[in-house]
């Protein structure tokens, strides 16, 4: 079989994620791959806050266009970047790997979150992280920052920040997790749906989707599908304040979610059988609406 062309964002982290997928494809299916880097709108415009982009999928649209034009055979994404309402031409055929989905603080002086000085300035471009940070400490000043992980880390010095909040998974994959000062529990900052997961997206009529599904991690797939369903039922997008975390243990699902309602952060949890994950997701979203 010919080499499979993998389209993904042109960043160091994205290349690492493509390498993870390419290795699994080679080991499991015996097929070679090549990387096709693609610049997305979110990569090009690094000044606008993510919540200010009017259309969803700012990190995926151009990659999906490359799928449609058959310039690439599959796309590799950080699953949290994919809108929960996908275009009918595409589907997620595999969730390949999920790292720790929690958020972390990297602070200037290496101190933990609750040891930060009063009115500390913390950098993030995420509305969800901002809402949760303010819920934990009202004195925190949130500063909007954009850029790749390395750029955001450098802004601690260049912009006089006391710290930045980032995805633990990204730092781990970049071997930068030694910089972590504090790991937020999911009750403190509920992760973005799909955070930490790498997924493969294909056209619905792709001749490769059946073989690529063989590298799917079943537990990671159920966890992330559950999280995305809750987000969908709540009418949220990738850059909303909604956080959802799901873990699986044998035949059970345990989930926790949070949403900003007015000026109050509402939280809810649920557990049940894996087979009932659709109804459980619906129940959890209704608990947050009530």
From Swiss-Prot:
One of its GO terms (cellular component) is cytoplasm. Its EC number is 2.5.1.61. Binds 1 dipyrromethane group covalently. Pathway: Porphyrin-containing compound metabolism; protoporphyrin-IX biosynthesis; coproporphyrinogen-III from 5-aminolevulinate: step 2/4. Its cofactor is dipyrromethane. It is an enzyme of class 2 (transferase). Gene3D superfamilies: Periplasmic binding protein-like II, Porphobilinogen deaminase, C-terminal domain. It catalyses: 4 porphobilinogen + H2O = hydroxymethylbilane + 4 NH4(+). Pfam families: Porphobil_deam, Porphobil_deamC. Keywords: Porphyrin biosynthesis, Transferase. One of its GO terms (biological process) is protoporphyrinogen IX biosynthetic process. The modification S-(dipyrrolylmethanemethyl)cysteine is found at residue 238. GO terms for molecular function: hydroxymethylbilane synthase activity. InterPro entries: HemC, Porphobilin_deaminase_N, Porphobilinogen_deaminase_C, Porphobilinogen_deaminase_C_sf. Tetrapolymerization of the monopyrrole PBG into the hydroxymethylbilane pre-uroporphyrinogen in several discrete steps. HAMAP family: Porphobil_deam (MF_00260). Monomer. The porphobilinogen subunits are added to the dipyrromethane group. Belongs to the HMBS family. This is Porphobilinogen deaminase. It comes from Caldicellulosiruptor saccharolyticus (strain ATCC 43494 / DSM 8903 / Tp8T 6331). The gene is hemC.
